[in-house]
Amino acid sequence: MKYNLNQLFKNHRIKGLSTNSKTVKEDEVFFAIKGQNVDGNDFINDALNNGAVLVITENKNNTAIDKVIYVEDVHKALYEAIEIFYPKKPKNLISVTGTNGKSSVVSYIAQAYSLLKKKAAFIGTIGLEIFGSNNIINDVPSLTTFDYLSFRKVAHNLAEDSIEYLAFEASSHGLEQGRLGKTKVNIVSFTSFSQDHLDYHHTKENYLLAKLKLFTDHLLPSGIAILNSDIEEIEFVKDYLHNNNVKFITVGKKGDLQITKITCSLTGQNIDFIFNNIIYNLHTLIIGSFQASNLLIAALTLYYTGFKFDEIIEALAKVKPIKGRMERIDGTNIFVDYSHTPDSLEKALIELKNIKLHGSKLSVIFGCGGDRDKTKRALMGQIAAKLADNVIITDDNPRFEDPKLIRAEIIRGIGTATYTEIASRAEAIKYGINNLKQDDILLIAGKGHETYQIIGDKKLPFDDSEVVRKYLFEISYTRN
C-alpha cells in the first residue's frame, strides 16, 4: 500500500520528525533507518514509548506493530517528509571543507556578514552561532556536519528567523555518509588538505575524493568554488573540478587572488594581496600566517554574494578569532590551538617559532586521540621534536585505548630528542607554565575549543583555556 505522506501527517497532526529513538518527542514521526553501527528498527518500541505517533520503516517484519508503516525506501520517505516539514533555508548557503581551517572560515564569513549589517549564522565543529538574532535553537547535534534531518531543521528555523546567510562545515565523514542529502549550495571552498582520518578512509586518495563530493554533488550550477592554491594536490583538484564543469577561483601565493606579503607578530598580522589587478592590505588581530588564506577565502565568499571589496576588507579587519584557534590567553604568551593533525601542528609551531623573540624558547604540550588515526602519532612527535625547544607529551581524549600506549607511539617519533611525559593534562599544563621564562611561548595543542576529556565512554569536563586561566590566577594570588 502506498501512502501520501502529506495527507498521512495531516491526519495525525504531526509536530516533527526524528531518526533518534532517544530524543524523539511526543507527536513526532520516527524514521527507522539502518545506519553503519545502529539499526533504527531495533528501537521502534523505544520510539513509541517515548511518544512517537508514527514509525516509518522499510522492514516488513515490524509492520505488525500498531502505528508502524511500511515504505519501500525509508530514506526517500524521510526526504519527502523533510520537504513537507522543513522546506525553508536561508537564501545564501555556503559550505567549507578542508583538513584544517573549516571552523575559522565559517566563523569569519558569518562575522563579516554581521558586521555588514546582515543576519548570518554558522554551523560547525564548535556548534551553531547566530548573528543578528536573540533566538535560541535547541537540539543541535555535536557533529562537524549534521545529519540531513538536523541540518534541515536548523536551516528551516534560521530561515524562519530571517537569517539570510548560513555558512557550514562539510567534513569528509559527513560527505561520505551523505549527511548533506540533496542540499545544494551557492559557494563552496577548500581550505587545506593533509593526512587525517585514515582510520576511516584508509587512503589519502579516498579522503580527498570524499571531500570533492562537496563540489560535484552539492554546488549549484550557478555557484563557484574557492580553492586554496597552496594545497599540494591543487593541480589534481583543479583538473577534477574542470572535468566536472565546476567553476572555481584560487587564493594563495600563486592564486587568482594573490597573497604577496604577510607580516606577523604576537598581536596580529598584515596581509598584502592583489585581486583584479588592485593592491589591497588587510590588518587583522588574528594570529597565524596560515589564517591569511582562510580570511581571504571569506573575503571572496562575500565578494561573490554581492559585496564590494573595500567594505569586505573593512569588515574582516574587525573579525575576531574563535575559541581554541591560536587563542592567546589574556595577553600572555600562552596559546591554545585545535591543531590535532601533523600539518596543523607543524603550521602552528612554525608560526610561533617565527614570531618569538630571539633567545626565547618555544614549548608545546599535546597528545593524540584514542580510537582514531594511529599513523599520525609518531609523525606528530617527530614534528614537535624538530620545531619546539621543549616537548611535553600528555593525554588527549584516550577513549578506550590505553593512554600510556598512545603516548608511547608519539614518543617513538621523538626519537633521541628530549621530552617530558605527564599523563594528567592539567598537570602537564601547570608544568609547562611553571617552566616558562621571560618572552618564552607555550603552545597547548589538540583540544582547542573542546570542553571535555573523553576517557572510555565518559566525557569529563576539561577546557585547556580555563585550566590555564585558573592556574595563572592561582599563581598570581599566591605571589600577592
From Swiss-Prot:
InterPro entries: Mur-like_cat_sf (IPR036565), Mur_ligase_C (IPR004101), Mur_ligase_C_dom_sf (IPR036615), Mur_ligase_cen (IPR013221), Mur_ligase_N (IPR000713), MurE/MurF_N (IPR035911), UDP-N-AcMur-Glu-dNH2Pim_ligase (IPR005761)
Binding-site positions, ATP: G98, T99, N100, G101, K102, S103, S104
Catalysed reaction equations from the record: UDP-N-acetyl-alpha-D-muramoyl-L-alanyl-D-glutamate + meso-2,6-diaminopimelate + ATP = UDP-N-acetyl-alpha-D-muramoyl-L-alanyl-gamma-D-glutamyl-meso-2,6-diaminopimelate + ADP + phosphate + H(+)
Reported cofactor(s): Mg(2+)
Assigned EC number: 6.3.2.13
Binding site residues for meso-2,6-diaminopimelate: R372, D396, N397, P398, R399, G446, E450
Cellular component annotations (GO), alphabetically ordered: cytoplasm
An individual GO BP term: regulation of cell shape
SUPFAM superfamilies (UniProt xref): MurD-like peptide ligases, catalytic domain, MurD-like peptide ligases, peptide-binding domain, MurE/MurF N-terminal domain
Annotated localization: Cytoplasm
The keyword Cell wall biogenesis/degradation belongs to this UniProt entry's keyword annotation: yes
Record PANTHER family: MUR LIGASE FAMILY MEMBER, UDP-N-ACETYLMURAMOYL-L-ALANYL-D-GLUTAMATE--2,6-DIAMINOPIMELATE LIGASE MURE HOMOLOG, CHLOROPLASTIC
Role according to the record: Catalyzes the addition of meso-diaminopimelic acid to the nucleotide precursor UDP-N-acetylmuramoyl-L-alanyl-D-glutamate (UMAG) in the biosynthesis of bacterial cell-wall peptidoglycan.
Protein name: UDP-N-acetylmuramoyl-L-alanyl-D-glutamate--2,6-diaminopimelate ligase
Organism: Rickettsia prowazekii (strain Madrid E)
Gene (name only): murE
